């Protein structure tokens, strides 16, 4: 059963084909994809394919991706989740994006906090990593604010529109008990 997580303002839930328009709106937006290592979506079919990829990720126990829904408007405003899940090594990488109209409202902090906590408690992770374009100042600041530590730079690690970009590597580890 797909886990539903809740915060004061948001519900993290399974993404379905009914969310295709919102996923398309997110991943066809230059401001979102600029630091994503992904070309802009050009069709709703690409959004449906991404939703199916998210479902397979969960079914195959390689990760999980939640849709971020506002409680007040029921609007899907982005996604967050884990990929590169390695249960044996108790680690995963976190990824997230929010549609620009909803930036600067504290939503990213709210969901990162919830998902990191879930990763440590429910999934038994001891390490959560993040890889972020060095140019993505907002996400770099956010991860530090959320308690992640910068571990280094991966040179020419991701390509965006055929151009290589350096990325910062971050991690947060479960506090020792």
Curated annotation (Swiss-Prot):
Q: Which residues form the N-acetyltransferase domain?
A: 10-177
Q: Give a GO cellular-component term.
A: cytoplasm
> What are the disulphide bonds in this sequence?
none
Q: Does the keyword Acyltransferase apply?
A: yes
Q: Give this protein's Gene Ontology molecular function annotations.
A: protein-N-terminal-alanine acetyltransferase activity
Root EC class: transferase
- Which parts pass through the membrane? none
Q: Does the keyword Mitochondrion apply?
A: no
The protein's Enzyme Commission number = 2.3.1.-
Q: Which UniProt keywords apply?
A: Acyltransferase, Transferase
Which Gene3D superfamilies does the protein's record reference?
3.40.630.30
Name the protein family. Answer: Belongs to the acetyltransferase family.
Protein name as annotated: Uncharacterized N-acetyltransferase YoaA
Source organism of this protein record: Bacillus subtilis (strain 168)
Q: Which gene encodes it?
A: yoaA
């Amino acid at each position: 059963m797909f886990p539903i997580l809740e915060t004061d303002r948001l519900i993290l839930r399974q993404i379905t084909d009914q969310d295709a328009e919102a996923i398309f709106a997110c991943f066809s937006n230059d401001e979102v994809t600029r630091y994503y290592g992904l070309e802009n979506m050009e069709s709703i079919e690409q959004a449906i394919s991404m939703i199916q990829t998210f479902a397979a990720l969960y079914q195959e126990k390689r990760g999980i991706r939640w849709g971020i829904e506002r409680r007040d408007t029921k609007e899907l405003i982005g996604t967050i989740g884990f990929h590169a899940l390695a249960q044996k090594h108790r680690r995963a990488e976190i990824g997230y994006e929010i549609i620009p109209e909803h930036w600067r409202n504290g939503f990213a902090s709210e969901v990162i906090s919830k998902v990191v906590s879930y990763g440590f408690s429910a999934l038994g992770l001891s390490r959560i990593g993040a890889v972020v374009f060095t140019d993505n100042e907002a996400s770099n600041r956010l991860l530090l604010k959320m308690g992640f530590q910068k571990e280094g730079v991966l040179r020419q690690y991701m390509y965006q529109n055929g151009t290589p970009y350096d990325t910062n590597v971050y991690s947060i580890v479960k506090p020792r008990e």
